[in-house]
């Protein structure tokens, strides 16, 4: 299992406050049954927050998470 660092995520979303919000929204989606957008190892028992951060670091999730629910 590769470790995820905040620095990896900050390369994608430079503002740490926006990063926190985007990862939180995505983690909530995953908790509610959302499908992960990255490939997961079936042996890893990563929490939704870790999966969300991995998605941000991989570029699969970004600032579009902050626009959820807005028309």
Swiss-Prot record:
Statement: the UniProt record of this protein carries the keyword Cell membrane:
no
Cellular component aspect of the GO annotation: DNA-directed RNA polymerase complex
Pfam families associated with the record = RNA_pol_Rpb6 (PF01192)
- Source domain of life is Bacteria
Q: Which GO terms describe its biological process?
A: DNA-templated transcription
Q: Which reaction does it catalyse?
A: RNA(n) + a ribonucleoside 5'-triphosphate = RNA(n+1) + diphosphate
Q: Which residues form a coiled coil?
A: none
Kindly indicate whether the keyword ATP-binding belongs to this entry. Answer: no
Tell me its EC number(s), please: 2.7.7.6
Note the SUPFAM superfamilies from the entry: RPB6/omega subunit-like
Arranged from A to Z, the UniProt key words for this protein are: DNA-directed RNA polymerase, Nucleotidyltransferase, Transcription, Transferase
- Biological role stated in the UniProt entry: Promotes RNA polymerase assembly. Latches the N- and C-terminal regions of the beta' subunit thereby facilitating its interaction with the beta and alpha subunits.
Q: What's the family?
A: Belongs to the RNA polymerase subunit omega family.
Q: Which NCBIfam families match?
A: rpoZ
Quaternary assembly = The RNAP catalytic core consists of 2 alpha, 1 beta, 1 beta' and 1 omega subunit. When a sigma factor is associated with the core the holoenzyme is formed, which can initiate transcription.
| Name of this protein | DNA-directed RNA polymerase subunit omega
């Amino acid at each position: 299992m590769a470790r995820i660092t905040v620095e990896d995520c900050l390369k994608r979303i430079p503002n740490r406050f926006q990063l926190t919000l985007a990862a939180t929204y995505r983690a909530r989606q995953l908790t509610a049954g959302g499908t992960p957008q990255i490939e997961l190892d079936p042996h890893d028992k990563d929490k939704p927050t870790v999966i969300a951060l991995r998605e941000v670091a991989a570029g699969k999730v970004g600032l579009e998470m902050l626009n959820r629910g807005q028309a």
